[in-house]
Every structure is written in C-alpha cells, then in structure tokens.
Amino acid sequence: MTLQQIKEIYSRPLTELILQALEIHNKNFGNDIELCSLKSIKTGTCPEDCKYCPQSGHYNTSIEKHKLLDKDSILAEAKNAKDAGSKRFCMGAAWKHIPKKDFDQVAEIITEVKNLGLETCVTLGSINADEATKLKQAGLDYYNHNLDTSREFYPEIITTRKFEERIETIRNVANADINVCCGGILGMGESLDDRFNLLLELLQLPAAPKSIPINTLIPIKGTPLGDKYTNAQIDSFELVRFIATTRILFPQARLRLSAGRENMSLETQTLCFLAGINSIFYGNKLLTENNATVNSDNFLLAKLGLKSNAELC
C-alpha cells in the first residue's frame, strides 16, 4: 500500500466509501460493538511534553494528580466495569517508562483483573523486551502505545520521546505475543497528508494492530493545544472518511471511537459506526476527561439495533 493509494481510497465519493467499509466490516465482525472501560491508575506529573495532554508535568492544568492506586480500588473499578457490560478493562498510567518499584504491583493487578474474566489492556509508556515478556506472563492481552500522528508532524506535538522509540516499544510488545493497540489523534492541526501518513505508519508496524483507537482532540485549558484551539480541527465528514479508510485498510482490527466522542452528535456517531467503528469506551469517564454517558450510549445502541459483545457471549 502506498500513500497515493490511501489518498485515492479516502477521496472516493462518501457513499461509495462508506458502503465498501460497511461491507468489509460486516464480513469480518457483524453487528456487535465492543465495550471497553478505561481507568487512570496513576494520574499526572508525567515527564513527557505531549501538547494535548493535561497529565504532562510541563503544563498547569486542573487535573487531580495521584500516585499508583492501590490494587483493591482498581479491582473494584474493574468489577463495576464488568457488571456494567464491559468486556475489556484498560488501565492507563502517566509514565514515560514504568518505574521498577511499581512494575510488580502492576503485573499483579493485571493478573487479578484477568482472573475476573475481563480482557486486559494497559498503557504504561515505553517498555523494553524483558518487561513485555513479564507483562505477557502476568496475563496481559493488549498493550496500547499510540503513534499519535505522522512521523513528519510528530515533532510539533512531542519533543521528549522520539517517534522511533514508539516503534521500538510496539516491536517489544509484538515480540512478546501481546496484541498491539495503536492509533492516533485527529484535529491537532495536522494536514490531510499527515493523516494519510499515520495510516501508512500503522500499516508498517512490526505487527498489525488488533485494536486501533481513533481519538479527536479534546482541547484542555492549560495545554498548548487547549490554549490554541477551542475545538478539534476536524469536521464530521473528515472523521467519517478517515474511519472508513481505516476500516478498508484494516479489515480485521477493532476500530475504537475514543477521546472526543462526548462532543459528537448521535448522528455523527451513527455515521462512524456505519464507516467501521465497532468499539467504544463505555463509562462516564475517560482518564481525566468526561466521556459520553452510559445512558446515552445505551440509548444510541438500542436505537441503532446494535448489540454489545457482552450481550452476545
């Protein structure tokens, strides 16, 4: 696949593009939506300078910071998520690299969440090959490490971690036989070509991502992008085109509509489902930011006749 071929797919008439994406989606997945819950298990004081992130220690934001939560409180959240219908419990920690003093505790938490009957996913920053192997042994199913944007635009967003470092972490995850969860963020001021190049980078990862989060910027006061923009710099039709193109390029990946969904109309979310989305974060909170409410999600899924994969088990 070349950059030009990706452009040609994206540029098709919208109805034709959505139809092809929907046909591919139905062939591989059918009518189910994966419900995932996301918990911030360590919040704030991150040494990274990601310009979109309120958890960066470089910026003055209003988030409530805390160290790694205790195991019992995390397990209680996981049980609640399962009872609410989630299939996967994702845990995020604001680290550039997991501290040695916390590694064993995180591994133990993964094992106990797995024992609840949930799929496990973590995002802990960079990990080396040995750490990836130990997380696999603990029962980890997915490791999230987003590319965020194209290689070319990346230095405009982050300077404390090189793009190639992200690729190396994904290589370590894949070599440990952990499923790769990797996507990006739209609406940070990037060009269309940057979005196409992000897709090309995802195609060229050491292992094909089994899960692709598609985020739109949530401008948060105190962050450089939050102070620059009041809304994500992408319209609904561009988002739907991007999702449909992603579905065509990744027919067997779960595409997750992630950050920014709270600000989308039900009609826009419906188009996203038609274009290939088959996973959402379910719950009123998304790390430090509000998410679409459980009630609104239940209403929309019922309105569209979509079933969660928990209901189909």
Swiss-Prot record:
EC class (word): transferase
Domain Radical SAM core: 28-258
Keyword hit for Phosphoprotein: no
Gene Ontology BP term (one): biotin biosynthetic process
Database matches in Gene3D superfamilies: Aldolase class I
Enzyme Commission number(s): 2.8.1.6
Binding-site residues for [2Fe-2S] cluster, renumbered to this chain: 90, 121, 181, 256
Keywords: 2Fe-2S, 4Fe-4S, Biotin biosynthesis, Iron, Iron-sulfur, Metal-binding, S-adenosyl-L-methionine, Transferase
Note accompanying the cofactor annotation: Binds 1 [4Fe-4S] cluster. The cluster is coordinated with 3 cysteines and an exchangeable S-adenosyl-L-methionine. Binds 1 [2Fe-2S] cluster. The cluster is coordinated with 3 cysteines and 1 arginine.
Reactions listed under catalytic activity: (4R,5S)-dethiobiotin + (sulfur carrier)-SH + 2 reduced [2Fe-2S]-[ferredoxin] + 2 S-adenosyl-L-methionine = (sulfur carrier)-H + biotin + 2 5'-deoxyadenosine + 2 L-methionine + 2 oxidized [2Fe-2S]-[ferredoxin]
Source organism superkingdom: Bacteria
Cofactor: [4Fe-4S] cluster; [2Fe-2S] cluster
Pathway: Cofactor biosynthesis; biotin biosynthesis; biotin from 7,8-diaminononanoate: step 2/2
Gene Ontology MF, one: iron ion binding
Chain's role: Catalyzes the conversion of dethiobiotin (DTB) to biotin by the insertion of a sulfur atom into dethiobiotin via a radical-based mechanism.
Similarity field: Belongs to the radical SAM superfamily. Biotin synthase family.
Known partners and oligomeric status: Homodimer.
UniProt-recorded name of the protein: Biotin synthase
Taxonomy of the source species: Bacteria, Pseudomonadati, Pseudomonadota, Gammaproteobacteria, Thiotrichales
Gene from which this protein is expressed: bioB
